[in-house]
C-alpha cells in the first residue's frame, strides 16, 4: 500500500499537522516538530504529546506514515568542532522529540564540508554523528535525504549515502529518503520510465531498497544535472508526470511515506488524488 501525503504545517500545535493532512485526504504526512530555523525549542509538554498522538489515532496515521524533518540549521558533517557539537546536540534533541511523540523516523539533510575538509572526512563525521544520536535514543530511525549537491552539500551521490550507512553501527536504525527533484538536479535522470528503471537499478545496487524509508515527490524547476534545488508542482517541471506514475505503479515504494514538497499547497489535495489514481490505473491494466 502506498502512503501518500505532503509536508504540512504544524502551526498552532503539532496535532494540527495530522488534521491538515486529513483535510487533503493524505495517507501520510511530514512535519517539523519545532521551528526549523531555530536551534532550540521549549521541551514538549505532556499535553502537546497527548494531543498529537490523539489526532494521529483519530485520523488513522501510524508512525510508519509520518516522516518528521529536522532543523535546516543542523550540519552533522561540520568541519569545526564547536559547530559540529552544536549540530549533534540539536540532532539528538530532534530524535528525542520524535521518540516522545511516538514517531519512528527522522528525515535530515546529511551535511556540508564547507570547503574545509574532504568529502571522505565529512561523510565519516556524519556517520559518527548518527552513531552518537542512535546511542542516546531508542526506536527512531535516522533517515538520510539525498541532496541536489548545492554548494558543499554532500548526499548528492548514491555513493555518499552508502558511505554514511557503512559507517553507522546499527544498520537497523538508518535509512534514506530519496527526493526526486534533488536526484534529478544531481544528475539522476527520471524523465522516462526507462530512465527511472536505470536510476533505481543504480540505487538498488549502490544503496539497496531495504534502506529506503521515505520519498519526497517533487518535480523540478531546476534543470537536469544543474545541482540546483528548486521544486515544482507535479508534471509542471523538468521531470514530468511519467516518473511519478512509474513510482506509484512499483511495489518497491509501498509502505513508506511518499511526501509532496511541491510549491503550491493549494493543489496538494489534487496532486495526492492524481497519485492515488495512478495506482488504480495499474490495477485496471
Curated annotation (Swiss-Prot):
Its cofactor is Zn(2+). The keyword DNA repair applies. It comes from the Bacteria. Zn(2+) 3 binds at residues 182, 229, 231. CDD domains: AP2Ec. SUPFAM superfamilies: Xylose isomerase-like. Binds 3 Zn(2+) ions. It catalyses: Endonucleolytic cleavage to 5'-phosphooligonucleotide end-products. GO terms for molecular function: deoxyribonuclease IV (phage-T4-induced) activity; DNA binding; DNA-(apurinic or apyrimidinic site) endonuclease activity; phosphoric diester hydrolase activity; zinc ion binding. This is Probable endonuclease 4. It comes from Escherichia coli (strain SMS-3-5 / SECEC). The lineage of its organism: Bacteria, Pseudomonadati, Pseudomonadota, Gammaproteobacteria, Enterobacterales.
Amino acid at each position: 500500500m502506498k502512503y501518500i501525503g505532503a509536508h504540512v504545517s504544524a502551526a498552532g500545535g503539532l496535532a494540527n499537522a495530522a488534521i491538515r493532512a486529513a483535510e487533503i485526504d493524505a495517507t501520510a504526512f511530514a512535519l517539523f516538530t519545532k521551528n526549523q530555523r531555530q536551534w532550540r525549542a521549549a521541551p514538549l509538554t505532556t499535553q502537546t504529546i497527548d494531543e498529537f498522538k490523539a489526532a494521529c489515532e483519530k485520523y488513522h496515521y501510524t508512525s510508519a506514515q509520518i516522516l518528521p524533518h529536522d532543523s535546516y540549521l543542523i550540519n552533522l558533517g561540520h568541519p569545526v568542532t564547536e559547530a559540529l557539537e552544536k549540530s549533534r546536540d540539536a540532532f539528538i534533541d530532534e530524535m528525542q522529540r520524535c521518540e516522545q511523540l511516538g514517531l519512528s523516523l527522522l528525515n535530515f539533510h546529511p551535511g556540508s564540508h564547507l570547503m574545509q575538509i574532504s568529502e571522505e572526512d565529512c561523510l565519516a563525521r556524519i556517520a559518527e554523528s548518527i552513531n552518537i544520536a542512535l546511542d542516546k535514543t531508542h526506536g527512531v530511525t535516522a533517515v538520510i535525504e539525498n541532496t541536489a549537491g548545492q554548494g558543499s552539500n554532500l548526499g548528492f551521490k548514491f555513493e555518499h549515502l552508502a558511505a554514511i550507512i557503512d559507517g553507522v553501527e546499527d544498520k537497523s536504525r538508518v535509512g534514506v529518503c530519496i527526493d526526486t527533484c534533488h536526484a534529478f538536479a544531481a544528475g539522476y535522470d527520471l524523465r522516462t520510465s526507462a530512465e527511472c528503471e536505470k536510476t533505481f537499478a543504480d540505487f538498488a545496487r549502490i544503496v539497496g531498497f531495504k534502506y529506503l524509508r521515505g520519498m519526497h515527490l517533487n518535480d523540478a524547476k531546476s534543470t537536469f544535472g544543474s545541482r540546483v534545488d528548486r521544486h515544482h508542482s507535479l508534471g509542471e517541471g523538468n521531470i514530468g508526470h511519467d516518473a511519478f506514475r512509474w513510482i506509484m505503479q512499483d511495489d518497491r515504494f509501498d509502505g513508506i511515506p511518499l511526501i509532496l514538497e511541491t510549491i503550491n499547497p493549494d493543489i496538494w489535495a489534487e496532486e495526492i488524488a492524481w497519485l492515488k489514481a495512478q495506482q488504480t490505473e495499474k490495477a485496471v491494466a
